[in-house]
Amino acid sequence: MNQKNSLGLNKCFLDLDNPFQLFQRWFEEAKKKEINDPNALALGTANKEGIPSVRMVLLKGHSEKGFVFYTNLNSQKGNEIKENPNATMCFHWKSLLRQIRIVGTLKQVDDQTADEYYNSRAYDSRIGAWASKQSSILHSRDELLDAIENYKKKYNDKDNVPRPSHWSGWNLTPSTIEFWLDGDNRIHERLKYSLDKNGSWTKSLLSP
C-alpha cells in the first residue's frame, strides 16, 4: 500500500502549506521522467466576449510571484490577454500520471526580465521573433523565409540583436493551484490550494 500524507493522499502530495514548493518538487520529477518538454503547458485565454482559445507554450520561469512564458504581444493570445487578463495553465505529465492546473491573472513582465531571457535565446530564435508576425495570414511560406533572411542581413552581428518591442513575457499570478494524481478506476486524487483575501493559501480535497 502506498504511504499517505496527513490528508490521506498519496505521499507525493507531501504535507506542504505552500503550493509553490509542491510545484517545484513535481516539476523537478517531471524533468527527470518526461521525455519531451516537461515545461510544456496548455495556456487557456479568452477574449472580451468570453470566447476561449488554448495552445501549448513553454514555461520559462517560475517563482512565488508566478509562472512566466514569452510570446509575440500582437499574436492572438497576446491580444486576448490585453482584453482579458484572466487565464489558466495546465501541465500534464503522462510519465508521472500527474497534472497541475493553475488559474490566475496575467501581467506583462518588465523590460529587463524580457531582455535577459530574449538575449539568452539562440540567434535564429531571436531573428524569428522579428520575422514572424504571429497569428497573421501568410500568403506563402516563402514570405516568412524571405523575412527571416532580410532580418539576418539587418542583424548580422549575432551578439547584437535587440528585442522587438512586440515580443515580451507574461507572468501568471495564481489564485488557485490544483494538483491531480491518476487513480485506479478513475478514483483520482485532487488537492486544491486557494489564495484567500489575506494572502494565505488554504488546502481543500476535491472529489474526483
Task: Enumerate the predicted regions with their spans.
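Binding-site signature for planar aromatic cofactors or substrates
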Residues: 1-208
